A protein has these predicted regions:
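Conserved AMP-binding
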Residues: 81-84, 105-107, 191, 228, ...
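Conserved AMP-binding/adenylation subdomain of ANL enzymes
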Residues: 216-233, 241-254
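Conserved AMP-binding A3 loop
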Residues: 49-53, 193-217
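N-lobe entry segment of adenylate-forming
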Residues: 1-50, 54-69, 73, 142-149, ...
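Conserved AMP-binding/adenylate-forming core of the ANL superfamily
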Residues: 21, 38-92, 109-114, 165-174, ...
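A short helix-loop-beta submotif of the ANL/AMP-binding
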Residues: 76, 82-102, 106-110, 118-125, ...
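ANL superfamily adenylate-forming
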Residues: 7, 131-189
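Conserved pre-ATP/AMP-binding loop-to-beta segment of ANL
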Residues: 37-38, 155, 160, 174-197, ...
Length: 254
């Protein structure tokens, strides 16, 4: 992944003004888990419902897998997952391992997958084996040898079987213990947390690198301007790889 380029003078200004800080998205999530452990965090259209504490436990199992596969702070993990509860679990698992999150649009086919995962230097891919009658496992198999850094792939099998011998999301949750907090990957609020892809309307999609501080400040202001607090519920129909879906659907509620 290309080095994050932030104007040093501007960064110092953001810090002085209190816009940016060293707090991370994981810090925010864990604080919310402590405050509202039994409150629902995510509900999807398949009937899955998870509280903050449930996502905390499930994501810690994902983090254990990521660490076991050699993921280190700053490594990129890509996930091509619909608007499902698993998206939030995988995202929080990445944060606990210190990985950079890289959600990918469900519409990406071979050329876009190759480009996006090579540019981000993806180490591990999460996806659904099937979605809307399309074989996403076969699509990933067709590009794996053309993504230089990609070592492992994990598939959700809720809509169809995984045929290629890949690890499944279900297997991770059943076999890995939650990663202890003292083993979480250490990150800083000024470091890159997320890569979002542009639409690619004028050429190949580009990866927009966002720091923890970028996202925290953005969603603090979003909630403030709309008067949102812990008593509100966010309905998010937008794709979660989109800035609207990710920021307002995954981050704002925490």
């Amino acid at each position: 992944m290309d080095t994050m380029k932030v104007n040093q003078k501007q960064k110092e200004y953001y810090l002085e003004q209190g816009y940016w800080g060293h707090e991370t998205l994981l810090d925010r999530f864990l604080r919310t888990v402590e405050r509202f452990p039994d409150r629902e965090y995510v509900v999807d259209d398949r009937g899955n419902r998870h509280t903050y504490s449930q996502v905390d436990v499930l994501s810690s199992r994902i983090a254990s897998y990521l660490k076991d596969m050699g993921i280190k702070p700053g490594d990129c993990v890509s996930f091509q997952v619909p608007v499902w509860s698993e998206f939030a679990v995988i995202a929080m698992g990445c944060l606990k391992a210190g990985a950079v999150m890289h959600p990918i649009a469900m519409c990406y086919e071979e050329p876009d997958l190759i480009h996006a995962m090579n540019k981000s230097d993806t180490k591990i891919y999460f996806g659904t084996a099937w979605f809307r009658g399309k074989d996403y496992e076969a699509r990933l198999l067709a590009v794996m040898d053309r993504v230089a850094g990609l070592k492992h792939a994990v598939f959700l099998d809720s809509l169809g079987p995984v045929k290629g011998g890949f690890t499944t999301y279900r297997e991770i949750l059943e076999t890995y213990d939650p990663l202890p907090r003292e083993e979480y990957g250490l990150m800083d609020g000024l470091e890159v947390a997320l890569i979002l892809g542009t639409s690619g309307t004028t050429g190949s999609n580009k990866g927009v690198m966002l720091t923890h501080s970028n996202i925290i400040f953005s969603e603090e202001q979003f909630n403030l301007e709309l008067g949102l607090d812990e008593n509100d519920i966010m309905f998010m129909p937008a794709p979660l790889n989109h800035a609207t879906g990710f920021h307002h659907g995954i981050i704002a509620p925490m």
